[in-house]
From Swiss-Prot:
Domain LTD: 466-584
Assembly and interaction partners: Forms some heteromeric filaments with ifa-1, ifa-2, ifa-3 and probably ifa-4.
Annotated GO CC locations: apical plasma membrane; cytoplasm; intermediate filament; nuclear envelope; nuclear lamina
Ranges for domain IF rod: 81-433
Name of protein: Intermediate filament protein ifb-1
Location in or out of the cell: Cytoplasm
Gene designation per UniProt: ifb-1
Regions of compositional bias (Polar residues) in chain numbering: 14-30
Region span, Coil 2: 286-433
InterPro entries given in the database record: IF_conserved, IF_rod_dom, Intermed_filament_ifa/ifb, Lamin_tail_dom, Lamin_tail_dom_sf
Family annotation (Gene3D superfamilies): 1.20.5.170, Lamin Tail domain (2.60.40.1260), Single helix bin (1.20.5.500), Vasodilator-stimulated phosphoprotein (1.20.5.1160)
Organism: Caenorhabditis elegans
Ranges where the record places region Linker 1: 117-130
Region (Coil 1B): 131-268
Tissues in which the protein is found: Expressed in epidermal cells. Expressed in amphid sensory neurons, the excretory cells, the vulva, the uterus, the rectum and some neurons of the tail. Isoform a and isoform b display a similar pattern of expression. Isoform a is predominant in pharyngeal tonofilaments.
Length: 589
């Protein structure tokens, strides 16, 4: 009974202290249980149980801090396991010494021991054969791990080359995009210059049109003045003719008066001939004086009238001629000016047509360039999305391979520890009676435990592994890039490279495990810049209200946590624009 108690003190369980990692691999291994001691209830026993479990790694990138913590935890766990194995080896040595002491007290079992000695070689060979297969399997696993590591290195090198190629294509696309922008800027400036020139020509055309209207009005006015001058000339000509007629009438009247005067003179001469000589002489002298005076008077009147008529006629003729000359000169100048303006208008219309054609061609070219730029941007964004998807897939594959390699290394370490224990048990201890009993009893107990679960061993309690998956989708440029697992914040991202996105009056709906729903309305006029994020914190979670970078949801102190969480972004029309789904699955072994 005492030996059973003492042996039960050595009964212990070995577990890997490495924490479960989600979404990669789960592997467990349990070594054989060894119980050594006498037969019956009083015999001692020892159970050695080793369980190595690896959870699955969460899909996503492994941060450097997490890798450093994992490496540190792994080293601490390895040191602890080494110390535990050293303690087990020391206890095994003590146990062997105790077996030696028990051999002296169990001389009565010499016959049974002799019988067992006959079976030593067979059992030892079976053990060697059995563990030789395990060693071969372990070596094969190590070789497979090395081969997989080489494959991973090859894939990583290929992915690096792909990444360099994508980076080169990205830089090429950026250069072409900058070149297209410069061309668009140049063409835009050329269009602006052409438009300004067109506007200037239109203003000049309008000015020439106004000047043509003014010249036409002046021409009409001068033509009216010319017609008026011609009418005045006709009137003056008629007046001159009237005056000439009056002069002719006066001349005829003068001739008539002269004839009358001559007749009177003849009559007076006749009377004078009949009168005395003195009287005749007197009247003759008087009559001569009177005739001379009348003649002089009529000569002066006729000469003055003639001079007045000639001077007035010459004045009117000169005025009419001057008006006609001025009208002709102005008419000629206006005709020349109108002709020149018509030529200028024709030239300007031709230039305007050419500029309009050139402007239409430039506008078409700008439109084609805009279409090409849009296509290039779409192809560039598609290439970026493909690159991101490839990088995520490569990262996931690398994480999977790293986890598998870590699992193989853990398995190798565990097998090395077991091999060291078995080697210590087999080398140099086969000649000892107590060790032979222990090995035989261990083999018997191991074969028995493979068939049924006895009361002499304790059941291994399974460890829980957690697997969390995230799924995102979006119908536009705004996506729900991140939801904090602890419900602190929700992050929106504008994935477009050069377009603002207005998320004002949008709503965020977060449904927890299909029961509770949290709704938050984004304030109006909140715009997310291209490539930027908008983080919406719950109340008292360390956020500040600084739109458009961050907002604070005062209605709740947490966004909530759960096993099945669906977060969606709904616009003002009630249309769902983006979703983020988080599912957590727990499994035990």
């Amino acid at each position: 009974m005492s030996s059973h108690k003492e042996s039960s003190e050595y009964e212990m369980q070995y577990r890997s202290t490495i924490q479960p990692r989600t979404a990669v691999r789960s592997q467990s291994r349990q070594s054989g249980n060894y119980v050594s001691g006498g037969n019956g209830a009083g015999s001692g026993g020892r159970v050695l149980k080793m369980v190595t479990e690896m959870g699955s790694a969460t899909v996503g990138g492994i941060s450097p801090a997490l890798s450093a913590n994992a490496a540190k935890s792994f080293l601490e766990a390895t040191d602890k396991e080494k110390k535990t194995l050293q303690g087990l080896n020391d206890r095994l040595g003590n146990y062997i010494d105790r077996v030696k002491k028990l051999e002296e007290q169990n001389r009565k079992l010499v016959a049974d021991l002799d019988e067992l000695r006959g079976k030593w070689g067979k059992d030892t060979s079976e053990i060697k054969i059995k563990y030789s297969e395990s060693l071969s399997t372990a070596r094969k696993d190590i070789d497979d791990a090395a081969r997989r590591k080489a494959e991973v290195d090859v894939k990583v090198a290929r992915h690096r080359d792909d990444l360099a190629e994508y980076r080169s294509r990205y830089e090429d696309i950026q250069q072409r995009r900058e070149s297209d922008r410069e061309k668009i800027s140049q063409w835009t400036n050329a269009i602006a210059d052409a438009q300004s020139e067109v506007e200037m020509l239109r203003a000049r055309f309008k000015q020439l049109t106004d000047e043509e209207k003014r010249v036409t009005a002046d021409n009409s006015r001068i033509w009216e003045e010319l017609q008026k001058a011609r009418s005045d000339l006709d009137d003056e000509t008629i007046g001159r003719i009237d005056f000439q007629n009056q002069v002719q009438t006066l001349m005829e009247e003068l001739e008539f008066l002269r004839r009358v005067h001559e007749q009177e003179v003849k009559e007076l001469q006749a009377l004078l001939a009949q009168a005395p000589a003195d009287t005749r002489e007197f009247f003759k002298n008087e009559l001569a004086l009177a005739i001379r005076d009348i003649k002089d008077e009529y000569d002066i009147i006729a000469k003055q009238g003639k001079q007045d008529m000639e001077s007035w006629y010459k004045l009117k003729v000169s005025e009419v001629q001057g008006s006609a000359n001025r009208a002709n000169m102005e008419s000629t100048y206006q005709r020349d000016e109108v002709k020149r303006m018509r030529d200028n208008i024709g030239d300007l219309r031709g230039k305007l047509g050419d500029l309009e054609n050139k402007n239409s061609l430039l506008e078409k070219e700008v439109q084609n360039l805009n279409y090409q730029l849009t296509d290039d941007q779409r192809q560039y964004e598609a290439a970026l999305n493909d690159r991101d998807a490839t990088l995520r897939r490569m990262r996931e594959e690398c994480q999977t391979l790293v986890a598998e390699l870590q699992a193989l290394l853990d398995t190798k370490q565990m097998l090395d520890a077991e091999i060291a224990i078995y080697r210590k048990m087999l080398e140099g201890e086969e000649t000892r009676v107590g060790l032979t009993q222990m090995v035989e009893q261990a083999v018997k107990t191991h074969s028995l435990q493979q068939q049924e679960n006895t009361d002499s061993t304790r059941s291994v309690r399974g460890e829980v592994s957690t697997k969390t998956t995230f799924q995102r989708s979006a119908k536009g440029n705004v996506t729900i890039s991140e939801c904090d697992p602890n419900g602190k914040f929700i992050k929106l991202e504008n994935s477009h490279r050069n377009k603002d996105e207005n998320v004002g009056e949008h709503k965020i709906r977060r449904k927890l495990d299909g029961r509770r729903e949290i709704v938050y309305s984004i304030p109006a006029n909140v715009v997310i810049k291209p490539g930027k994020n908008l983080t919406i914190y719950a109340r008292d979670q360390g956020g500040i209200n600084n739109p458009p970078e961050s907002l604070v949801f005062d209605g709740e102190n947490t966004w909530g946590i759960g096993a099945n969480v669906v977060t969606s972004l709904v616009n003002k029309d009630g249309e769902e624009r983006a979703t983020h789904t988080q599912k957590t699955i727990q499994s035990g072994q």
